[in-house]
Each structure stands twice: as C-alpha cells, then as structure tokens.
C-alpha cells in the first residue's frame, strides 16, 4: 500500500511541475511586452497621481457642470433657508372642479386650419 502511494506522488509532482512551467512561459511574453512598452514610453507609470495638467486642475477647486449645479451648491451654503410664503398662506386650491359651463368661451382662431378646410378633391 505504501508503494502505491509513492508511485502516485511522483506523477502528481510532475503534473504540478508542468503547470509551473506553463505559467512561467505564459508570464515571460507578458514581461517582454511590458519591457518593450516601458522602453518606448518611459514617462508612463512614474506618477501615480496622473499628469501635471490633471493635478493642476484638481488643485484649482470644484468646477460646476452647469448653472443648476452652481445654484444647488449655493443653496447648500445658505444652510437650507427656505423662502417664506407671502400673505396667502391659507389659500386653498382645488376645492372647485370646473365644468364646461364654468369655462369661458373659446376664442376663434384668426388662421383657418388646412385640415378643417373641408374641400375634397
């Protein structure tokens, strides 16, 4: 029984060795490509923060996308002060449902519609 285990272990080791060599061969082309790119573009990868232009723009402060963003930021600075309503605070709307008789007469249009001409050819 011990002989069978010893026979199985060398087979497993050779399988693991094959995987290791395949991984090493797979890594070598990647390393070669990285070396080529580093030789071609030596300035890449040196600054973790990005380019000087980007760092300068980030140091200037917050920029707003449009006037809506600016107004929202401005409103936050005012500590959320809500504008007070005028003297009509007790005004209730929606208690009367209009009917066709309550509505004023519709004004006639000065320009006649081409669709309402009524002429059929």
Curated annotation (Swiss-Prot):
Q: Where does the record place Basic and acidic residues bias?
A: 16-37
Is the Cell division keyword given for this protein? Answer: yes
Extract the ranges annotated as region (Disordered). Answer: 1-53, 79-121
Residues carrying N-acetylserine: 2
Protein localization: Cytoplasm
A single MF term (Gene Ontology) = phosphatase inhibitor activity
Any single GO BP term: mitotic cell cycle
PTM info? The N-terminus is blocked.
Which domain of life does this protein belong to? Eukaryota
Q: Does the keyword Cell division apply?
A: yes
Q: Which InterPro entries match?
A: Endosulphine
Q: Which residues get modified to Phosphothreonine?
A: 21
Any one Gene Ontology cellular component term annotated for this protein: cytoplasm
Q: Which UniProt keywords apply?
A: Acetylation, Cell cycle, Cell division, Cytoplasm, Mitosis, Phosphoprotein, Protein phosphatase inhibitor
Which residues in this protein are found as Phosphoserine? 2, 43, 67, 109
Oligomeric state and interaction partners are given as:
Interacts (when phosphorylated at Ser-67) with PPP2R2D. Interacts with ABCC8. Interacts with SNCA; interaction is disrupted when phosphorylated at Ser-109.
Protein role = Protein phosphatase inhibitor that specifically inhibits protein phosphatase 2A (PP2A) during mitosis. When phosphorylated at Ser-67 during mitosis, specifically interacts with PPP2R2D (PR55-delta) and inhibits its activity, leading to inactivation of PP2A, an essential condition to keep cyclin-B1-CDK1 activity high during M phase. Also acts as a stimulator of insulin secretion by interacting with sulfonylurea receptor (ABCC8), thereby preventing sulfonylurea from binding to its receptor and reducing K(ATP) channel currents.
Task: Report the sequence similarity comment from the record.
Answer: Belongs to the endosulfine family.
What is this protein's record name? Alpha-endosulfine
């Amino acid at each position: 029984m011990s002989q069978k285990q010893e026979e199985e272990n060398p087979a497993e080791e050779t399988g693991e060795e094959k995987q290791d060599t395949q991984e090493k061969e797979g890594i070598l082309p990647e390393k070669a490509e990285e070396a080529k790119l580093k030789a071609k573009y030596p300035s890449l990868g040196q600054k973790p923060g990005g380019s000087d232009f980007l760092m300068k723009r980030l140091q200037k402060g917050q920029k707003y996308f449009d006037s809506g963003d600016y107004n929202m930021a401005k409103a936050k600075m005012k500590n959320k002060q809500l504008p007070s309503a005028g003297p009509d605070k007790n005004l209730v709307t929606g208690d009367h449902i209009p009917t066709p008789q309550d509505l004023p007469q519709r004004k006639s249009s000065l320009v006649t519609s081409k669709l309402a001409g009524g002429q059929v050819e």
